[in-house]
């Protein structure tokens, strides 16, 4: 009787990534929109918005292309006339209102970009819209970063660095009328950029007063802590950017991030038996062959539990957690409260 070799979560995950086609470049995606009849500038902007936010305000478009109110208004009217954009809020007498929010929803655009089911196309709460506008503002200011716009591209990046999906923030969704479950990664849907040496994570959360914002920032950091530890274990640097609407918010969040900045603590010494267990789990995870764990540790589940006890013991002995190498702040002046009401 032949025994079927079991596959670990990482092995299955890697196989899926490798089987997938290489995602198109930004230039290739923009070319797909030009094929629909959009001009170079229109295709460039629509590609940026669809990939990174789904929403924009006129002043963001003006800043990127250094254009005035008139050309911007004509551009927005073209998008609305084509049925691919909705603009929230009434235009004032000048036919221009910088606080209006444009939502790019046209299915044909997202389909051409290969992201037809992207959530940016759907309506969202005001909280989510503001978060997307803030994070998009940073992306616009830093086009030189190697942005990873979609979930598959982010996952593939971490996989290339040898990082297990188990440490990537994730959530399982269950359908209302089916037993089928869907696992989604990086559900905060905030920008990430990486070049293999350093990885940048953008945080934007404008909801509530100072105390609530501080609590939500801490929650976001903890959700990413295992991923950041894995990056640093591989000698990668973690850079966090917090995007805010005021300088006061930026200062408050910088103070919080400072508590997590610093070198990772030295590794705690392991006994020979503990190291053998961790090595055996790493080997099983990379090969998909769990039989050695059956023979020596009573199976994969007991081995995983023992490994968790080892890691928890080591973590408790390391002192205050340090997850990031650097941080910075970005005040989105185009989105400050006196420009765009909360």
Predicted stretch roles:
Residues 49, 76-83, 138-146, 221-232, ...:
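Hydrophobic, Leu/Ile/Phe/Ala-enriched alpha-helical segments that form helix-helix packing faces
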Residues 1-109:
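Basic, Lys/Arg-rich alpha-helical nucleic-acid-recognition elements, primarily the DNA-binding modules
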Residues 100-130:
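Short, amphipathic alpha-helical interaction segments positioned at domain boundaries
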Residues 55-56, 109-121, 195-204:
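Glycine-rich, often proline-containing surface loops adjacent to acidic residues and nearby aromatics
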Residues 205-265:
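Catalytic cores of nucleic-acid endonucleases
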Residues 247-342:
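Non-catalytic C-terminal interaction segments of nucleic acid-processing enzymes
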Residues 193-228, 288-317:
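Charge-rich, low-complexity terminal tails
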Residues 122-216:
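Exposed, interaction-prone assembly regions rather than primary DNA-binding/catalytic cores
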